[in-house]
Amino acid sequence: MIRAYEQNPQHFIEDLEKVRVEQLTGHGSSVLEELVQLVKDKNIDISIKYDPRKDSEVFANRVITDDIELLKKILAYFLPEDAILKGGHYDNQLQNGIKRVKEFLESSPNTQWELRAFMAVIHFSLTADRIDDDILKVIVDSMNHHGDARSKLREELAELTAELKIYSVIQAEINKHLSSGGTINIHDKSINLMDKNLYGYTDEEIFKASAEYKILEKMPQTTIQEGETEKKIVSIKNFLESEKKRTGALGNLKDSYSYNKDNNELSHFATTCSDKSRPLNDLVSQKTTQLSDITSRFNSAIEALNRFIQKYDSVMQRLLDDTSGK
């Protein structure tokens, strides 16, 4: 997404430099190269200059027309695509706008332009904008912004929730041994955290596509002996000691913890695991609230778009009915 030049020309230029000309609306315009050449022939300099009255961030002044590729991007950013129907209303409107831009560039005595001023002068001539285009652009931009943010939040929340689920499996195993007053081995006699059944999965392929599996496959493994065969597992200790998770590594772990009413190291271990996962639980709650908010905004943008299209269609239909009735 390219930030508006009106708010911060430096950010506008930075964003333009990150994209290819082919990604901009007017890259295929039949007059793009002609306009670039006209700016060069008239020795027009377009620059960005820090204005303390408008700009919140200080940036270095820069003549951007020294870079022909950047000049082409600036023009392609606002230049519309050629009309598909030649000679139609849109094509005539577009050609008249381009004609006005050419006349302006050829006749203006001023060859030194600040980017904001240059864009302000040519924008409404160069584009065939209508008010409905502007409204649609604002709504669609809002949808895209909130849609992207929602997708990123969903991915992050899925990862956080998966890690929290693994902690809940560990906590359940600890609680089982607390209830029985026994000893939990978290190393070579540990439950295998790679067991899909622990997370409610019955299909191996579905489990391998899950967020839990994506976390666990990054963990170190422990080799255990099952009869005459060796097997690799992700033990509780492997998981807790690993830095390859959001909550980081938990150090100074023993291989096993026993219940003892006088010095209950198993209870202390349970508390340690709970304390380790508590910030993660808080973060999941925070991200869930953010996702709910951003989803609401996204849905509002869709609703606004639907209402606008319905209203636009209704107005156009009435105009057509009035015209056909005359």
Swiss-Prot record:
Transmembrane segments: none annotated. It is found in: Secreted. The keyword Secreted applies. Keywords: Plasmid, Secreted, Virulence. Disulfide bonds: none annotated. GO terms for cellular component: extracellular region. SUPFAM superfamilies: Virulence-associated V antigen (SSF103388). InterPro entries: LowCa_resp_V_Ag (IPR005413), Vir_assoc_V_ag_sf (IPR036139). The keyword Glycosyltransferase does not apply. Involved in calcium regulation of yop expression, which includes the export process. This is Virulence-associated V antigen. It comes from Yersinia pseudotuberculosis serotype I (strain IP32953). The lineage of its organism: Bacteria, Pseudomonadati, Pseudomonadota, Gammaproteobacteria, Enterobacterales. The gene is lcrV.
